[in-house]
Amino acid sequence: MPDIRTDWDAIVIGGGPAGSTTARYIAEGGGGVLVIDGRDPIGSPLQCGELVPTNNEMRRLCPDVPDLDDLLQTPEAAISKRIREMHLVPPSGKPLRYDFEGLVLNRVAHDEALIELAESAGAEYLVNSRVERVEGETVYLRDGSEYTARVIIGAAGHNDPIRKSQWHEEALDIPVKFVLMSGEFTDAVELHFGSVAPGGYAWMFPKNGGANIGLGIQRSLSKGRSLNDYAEDFISRYRGQITYNGAGSLPMSGSIRPLVKGKHLLVGDAAGMVLPSNGAGITIAMIGGRIAGQVVAEHLR
C-alpha cells in the first residue's frame, strides 16, 4: 500500500473515463482528489467494443457540448484504427452504409492517457484497491484501510458500491460477450440487428491487425438460448485467431434520477450515462465527468 494521506476533498471510486475525467476537473478546480480503483492497470480487463466518435463527429452529434477538443484528448498511441464508414445490418442482411468518423481504441492506452491528464492536474490514484463499502464521508477498503472525503463520487460502473447501496431502482443491464480476433477485416464498423442478437445488437469493430467482435442480448427475448450460443454463432462468421475473450454489460435503463444523494453522486455507467441507441458510454461518460468535476470543484470552494 503506498504512503498516501487519508483525508481528501473528494474521492472518486473507479478510474475509467468517467472517474478520471471527474478527477481531472476537480483537481483543475483546486480540489484535492483521490481516485480508488480495484484494477491494475486501469482499463483492463477489457469490457467493451472500444469504438468512439471522432471529435468532429461528436460536434455533429452533440452540438451544444463546448470545448470538446479540450475534453476528448485521444493520443495516437491510444488509436488502433480510424473509421470512415458504418454498416448497419438489418434482419434482411443487406447493409445500410453511412459515413461515420470514428476511432477504435486501444482501451488501456486510452485510459492511461486520461489518468495522465488527471494526475497532471493534481489528482492522485490508488490502484489494486477494492472498495468494501461507503458510509457517509468514509470509504472502507477490503484491506481494512479507510479514506474520508467531503464528497464521494461513484464511477465504478453498474456494480458501483455507492449505486448498489443507495440507489435501488430496477436496472436493465444487457449482458455482452466479445472477442479480440487477429486477421484481416473490412475498414467499416458493422452493427447487426434482429434475431442475431435479440433485444440488443452485434458488432464488428476493425482494429489494427484484427477486430473486436461481439454482441449483447436481452435474455427475456432469447427464446431459451444462452448468450454464449448467440455469441458463438455470430463470431463464427468471421475468420481469424481469437486472442482474447471478454464479457461485460451495457446499462440500458436510462439516466438515474437523482444523480446526487447527500455527499454522494454518480457519474458514467454507474449513473446510466450512455447513448440510448446502443449503450455506448465512453464519450458520454467523459462529458458527464467534466460536468460533475466542475460542479464538485465549485461546491468545494
Regions from the PLM with identified roles:
Residues 1-10, 25-31, 211:
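Extreme N-terminal leader/targeting segments of oxidoreductases
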Residues 11, 15, 27-48:
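Glycine-rich FAD pyrophosphate-binding loop
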Residues 39-86:
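N-terminal FAD cofactor-binding segment of flavoenzymes
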Residues 260-277:
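Short FAD-binding loop at a beta-strand-to-alpha-helix junction that anchors the flavin cofactor
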Residues 15, 29, 41, 113, ...:
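Predominantly flavin-linked oxidoreductase catalytic cores and closely associated redox partners
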Residues 19-20:
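N-terminal Rossmann-fold NAD(P) dinucleotide-binding loop
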Residues 291-301:
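Active-site-proximal substrate-binding core of FAD-dependent oxidoreductases
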Residues 87-106, 138, 207-219:
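Helix-loop-beta segment of a Rossmann-like dinucleotide-binding subdomain
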